Each structure stands twice: as structure tokens, then as C-alpha cells.
Amino acid sequence: HRLGANEAPPAVLSVYLGDSLSAIIRAIAYGKEAAGGCSEPLQIGVSVLPNIPRDLSDRNRTSPFAFTGNKFEFRALGSSQNIATANISLNAAMACALDDIASMLEAELAQGTPLNAAIQSLLAKLFAEHMPIVFDGNGYSDEWLAEAEKRGLPNLKDTVAALAHYSDKDVMAVFERHGVLSPREMLSRQEILLENYTHSVSIEGHTALKLGRTRILPVALAYQTRLAKAASSAAALVDDAAEEKAYFVRVREQVRGLMSALDTLEAAVNGDFGGTALARAAYARD
């Protein structure tokens, strides 16, 4: 997760609609009367200030896909990513959804169903089917992760897991259906994105290794040497230098751990990245 998933959209995609709109959609989906649209006061934690009513379109900053009164905001774009891919994907999915809705509505009308009745029936069916994606709570909470799993929502925790779905047949069908991207174009983009990820992680690994070997380890060894001399001097002057020796041993264990970690990192960054682009990216991730 970027920034630990606590300062960025969570990996589980959900849609925030707000209490008022969610109540209306649930009423349509399940044939119930919608609750009133009165807003609750904001909980600002200051008793001397008057109650401030919450705007019905008050934003949920933890939602990756939020309705903010007159528009939806898609917030799951990576900081280094171009917005084009997200826009292409969203528009392709929207085109397919509208095409499906139009086909279902035309089929109902062809059977003689009145327009308003067909629309109401279709809306109720679609809203009920897609209610699992609607969530107005805290998208960062562990409770939401458990609830999302119950709802059957995917939780793609890393880049490689997400890019692996580029080649899914149903995903490629969405882009191919309206001539946006062919399967071959989808696979080529998947290959490029996986290679970019692998190279980025490899560069980061080699950089960390160089910093550890040339900047951190020499300082740690110099400090260890100073402690060794101090402990040796203390032992020569007094009978009880156990504390100095114990501290030296603690630092030495940390330095040994650093050296071992650097050796492990070196073996990893110089290891075999062979195989498919997906396998190489998975190796880099792991």
C-alpha cells in the first residue's frame, strides 16, 4: 500500500455516496421508503461552538471513489502514474455498463413493459446487485477489510497482484468490446508495466545496498571499534566492566545483523529474475 494505506486510498475499491444518497438507493433497491434527508451535526469536539450541520455531500477522505455532491472523484491513482490509463479504464467500463443498461431496457420495452415501470424495475435490480460496492464508513479500518471480504470484493495489496489481472479474459473483453484496446494491446501494456515495476524495484534495491555498504556500515563499524576500545580500557582500569562489555556486545550483534541483511539484499538484487514478466515482477516484489 502506498504510504501504508493510511494517507492514500485503500486497496479495496468501494464507492462512497453519502448517507442521503445511500438511503435513497437502498430504498429503490429493496422497495422501502427512504429516510428523511436531515443531516447530522458535525462532531468537532469543541463544546463552546454551536452545532454545525453536516453537508449532505460531506466528503469521506478514506474512500477511493467518492460522490461529492455533483460528481464522482476517483482517488486511487498512484502518485507517479499518468491519469490517461485510469480515464481510459473508467470510460471503457462506463461505456459497457451503459450499453448493457440500454440493452436490458430495450428488451423490457419490447415485451410491452411501460417505460417508467421498466426503469424502476431495472434500477432496483442493478442497485441491489451492486450494493456490496457501496461503503460510507472508514476505508482504512480492519473492520472494513473483513466486511469487504464477506462482500466478495478483491483486496489487491500490491502492484504485481493488480497488474496480473490485465490479462483476465473479462477485463480484456471490456476494452475490446468498444474497440478501445485489443487483447494484444492489453498484453503489451501489461508486459511494459510489469517490466517498469521490476526495474524500479531493482534500482531501489541496488541503491539501498550501496548506501548500506558505503554509508551506514562504515559508521557502524567505526562506532563498534570505539566501543571495543572503551570496554577494553575500562576492563584494564577496574575489575567490574561488565556493563561496558555488555553494551559492546549489543552493538556488535546489531552490526552483525546489518552485515547479514546487506548480504541477503545483495543476493536478492543479484538473483535470477528470469521467467515471464509477471514472474520477474513477483520476484522483485518478494
Predicted regions, residues:
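Acidic, glycine-enriched catalytic cores built around paired aspartates
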Residues: 1-286
